[in-house]
Amino acid sequence: MAKLAVVRDLRDAQPEPAPEEVADFETDVFAGFVLARSAAGLSDSTIRCDVSHLEQVRAWLDRPLWEMTPADADTYFGTVLRTAPVNTRLGRSQALRTYFEFIGLRHRVQIHAMTGIVAQCPIDEINRPRGQRRPALRIPPTAEQVRCLFTGWRAELATCRKFAPMARNFAAAKLMSQVGLRVNEVRHLDLADIKWELGRFGKIHVRHGKGARGSGPRERMVPLINGADRTLRWFVQDVWSQLGDDPDRPGAPLYCSERHNADGTSARIGTEGLRAPLADAAAAHLPDWSARLTPHVLRHFCASQLYFGGMDLIAIQETLGHAWIATTMNYVHVHRTHVEDAWVAGQQRAADRLKGLSS
């Protein structure tokens, strides 16, 4: 009877890697993950959020993420994140699952050859965090409070040290409160995106609307209602030339930074350049909302005021650029009265029945 021969691996034996080599390889893998997500069309903010989740898990684990086991995930999600908000737990879990899917497709063989570890996702059907992402309930400031904010801010324009930058910040915040644009949509507006000839009041071409599920930016036309046309006319005619360079230049930004590009043209303002002045104005003129008033709160305020003024949900949905009407309903909850109306109608029906019994 033939005997079984000893099978020997003919591949070159891999020496144990130095810690520096493992660290460099981990950095390369992480950089490849970021590049792959960018290639998939995800926005920079989404990628930054995933990276933040992974970095926090890595800091807790204190070793490469591919060494994380289901037992480690049980400890992390069962103790460290036990009392964390549902959205935090779900986001961190999804980031880990996506990262390990990337490792499995691109680097599993290399990781095994280098470390002897077979990388597997530590999140399974047993320990996967349950729950559903729900938007936070936001109650925007009242119309009187927002009026007080912009009245005080406008008065400050007469005495401020730099008129043009403050007027730019004022006009951008005012526009967000009037037609509900997102801060990233506002910063990407060009001067040529204002179409005065369209519609009754003019329209603005939003080219960088928020996308979803890798759709990329969603464009839309927003009518300059609710006084937005007056805000933009004042800014373009009286302020823009103090910050911008050539109004006929293709791609000239609507809201310019004080800095310039390498070629001498006006640079585009960043999102933080719009957020910080709004926070400062709220602290000065609306202290009840200090550290709470953001561009997104102004967006909720706009939706609530449009609904309160009689605008239907479909029109508000188109103005805000929502893909689903259910999202818009979360924005106008403050002024919706269907519960109160149902209660009043029920009381009236009960009163009518009692009248019939007493007659």
Give, region by region, the residue ranges found by the protein language model.
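Catalytic-site neighborhood detector that most strongly recognizes the C-terminal catalytic loop/helix
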Residues: 320, 326-345
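Basic, Lys/Arg- and aromatic-enriched nucleic-acid-binding interface segment
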Residues: 148-183, 249
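Active-site/catalytic core of tyrosine-dependent DNA strand-transfer enzymes
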Residues: 225-289
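Short, basic (Lys/Arg/His-rich) helix/loop patches that form interaction surfaces
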Residues: 158-161, 275-318
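N-terminal core-binding DNA-recognition domain of tyrosine recombinases/integrases
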Residues: 31-136, 156-161
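C-terminal secondary-structure termini that scaffold catalytic or DNA-interacting sites
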Residues: 1-17, 346-359
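Flexible interdomain linker/hinge and immediately adjacent N-terminus
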Residues: 9-13, 109-153, 210-213, 258-267
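Conserved tyrosine-mediated DNA breakage-rejoining catalytic core shared by Y-recombinases
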Residues: 188-232, 240-241, 246
